[in-house]
Swiss-Prot record:
<dbReference type="GO" id="GO:0005525">
    <property type="term" value="F:GTP binding"/>
</dbReference>
<keyword id="KW-0282">Flagellum</keyword>
<keyword id="KW-1003">Cell membrane</keyword>
<dbReference type="GO" id="GO:0060090">
    <property type="term" value="F:molecular adaptor activity"/>
</dbReference>
<feature type="binding site">
    <location>
        <begin position="183"/>
        <end position="191"/>
    </location>
    <ligand>
        <name>GTP</name>
    </ligand>
</feature>
<dbReference type="GO" id="GO:0007283">
    <property type="term" value="P:spermatogenesis"/>
</dbReference>
<keyword id="KW-0158">Chromosome</keyword>
<dbReference type="GO" id="GO:0030154">
    <property type="term" value="P:cell differentiation"/>
</dbReference>
<dbReference type="GO" id="GO:0030496">
    <property type="term" value="C:midbody"/>
</dbReference>
<dbReference type="GO" id="GO:0000776">
    <property type="term" value="C:kinetochore"/>
</dbReference>
<keyword id="KW-0137">Centromere</keyword>
<dbReference type="GO" id="GO:0003924">
    <property type="term" value="F:GTPase activity"/>
</dbReference>
<feature type="site" description="Important for dimerization">
    <location>
        <position position="156"/>
    </location>
</feature>
<keyword id="KW-0744">Spermatogenesis</keyword>
<dbReference type="GO" id="GO:0007224">
    <property type="term" value="P:smoothened signaling pathway"/>
</dbReference>
<dbReference type="GO" id="GO:0031105">
    <property type="term" value="C:septin complex"/>
</dbReference>
<feature type="modified residue" description="Phosphoserine">
    <location>
        <position position="218"/>
    </location>
</feature>
């Protein structure tokens, strides 16, 4: 056997080495070849810069034909669901990113109806995945379940509005919520910290379940542990988005130009944009796992229970019909038996009358 042929196999002369230590590399290659899927929902009132932030996060334009509605249109406007999918490739790794936007949220006078549209969409994706998972061909299931929801909070209030509380409580058992303070450049650093604390206190007060970053494993390096600690401390993330390149300190940066200076989007000293993007990228797998193991399983269990109750009710109805038919048969049999008994009595009575008359004669 030639040397080239021998190199195709695990070297038998390596003591104590079987070769399954290479399995993670196989999984990695397979995952890279298949690509990744992720669905991000963005919810918040109009004018908070949601579209700009999403374009900034992924360096792409997901809304090239978006038209901003006027004030008159907003009054009559109902919430819509707009899903945009884009294929992003970076260093050979493909990501199929779907961003679900909800234009019209919070614009109507009665905002309760907008909850139903968004909740129905989340449930529909669960229902579709359950249907595909239960089918015969399960090799190419497209996962459109909502893995994460960026909920945008206005920086102009003093915390959460009643609408914010009601909506987050309505969806927190269905999707991973990441609270985001929009337009952080309208706040001073002290105002930003006060608003963050106020929002966290209100989230705890109202028992709202937001996405909690998992603790770093003990065997992780110190840099990753410190990164995890900083990300946790930054929730809710206060962000600035911009698609404009401006010159600052002799270099081109994405940011916003003001008379008093420049706010750089990707400067961690100016806002939490980089932290938000780092959180999303480094915890994308965990967000998918929580969606699968917690939110989807809860939906699936409830759905199967409802289906089970439906089947049980159908069985009960069938049993009831059988019992009614059996009762009807018994009534008919009893009626026939009574008729036969009456006929028998009549026959016996006729014979008796003949015997009596014969004695008198």
């Amino acid at each position: 056997m030639s040397k080239q042929q021998q190199t195709q196999f695990i070297n038998p002369e390596t003591p104590g080495y079987v070769g399954f230590a290479n399995l993670p590399n196989q999984v990695h290659r397979k995952s890279v070849k298949k690509g990744f899927e992720f669905t991000l929902m963005v919810v918040g009132e109009s004018g908070l810069g949601k579209s700009t932030l999403i374009n900034s996060l992924f360096l792409t334009d997901l809304y090239p034909e978006r038209v901003i509605p006027g004030a008159a249109e907003k009054i009559e406007r109902t919430v819509q669901i707009e899903a945009s999918t884009v294929e992003i490739e970076e260093r050979g790794v493909k990501l199929r990113l779907t961003v679900v936007d909800t234009p019209g949220y919070g614009d109507a006078i009665n905002c309760r109806d907008c909850f139903k549209t968004i909740i129905c969409y989340i449930d529909e994706q669960f229902e579709r995945y359950l249907h595909d998972e239960s089918g015969l061909n399960r090799r190419h299931i497209i996962d459109n379940r909502v893995h994460c929801c960026f909920y945008f909070i206005s920086p102009f209030g003093h915390g959460l509005k009643p609408l914010d509380v009601a909506f987050m409580k309505a969806i927190h058992n269905k999707v991973n919520i990441v609270p985001v303070i929009a337009k952080a450049d309208t706040l001073t650093l002290k105002e930003r910290e006060r608003l963050k604390k106020r929002i966290l206190d209100e989230i705890e007060e109202h028992n709202i379940k937001i996405y909690h970053l998992p603790d770093a494993e003990s065997d992780e390096d110190e840099d990753f542990k410190e990164q995890t600690r900083l990300l946790k401390a930054s929730i809710p993330f206060s962000v600035v988005g911009s698609n404009q390149l401006i010159e600052a300190k002799g270099k081109k940066v994405r940011g916003r130009l003001y008379p008093w200076g420049v706010v750089e989007v990707e400067n961690p000293e100016h806002n939490d944009f980089l932290k938000l993007r780092t959180m999303l990228i480094t915890h994308m797998q965990d967000l998918q796992e929580v969606t699968q193991d917690l939110h989807y399983e809860n939906f699936r269990s409830e759905r199967l229970k409802r289906g089970g109750r439906k089947v049980e009710n159908e069985d009960m109805n069938k049993d009831q019909i059988l019992l009614e038919k059996e009762a009807e048969l018994r009534r008919m049999q009893e009626m026939i038996a009574r008729m036969q008994a009456q006929m028998q009595l009549q026959l016996q009575g006729g014979d008796g009358d003949s015997g009596v008359h014969g004695q008198h004669v």
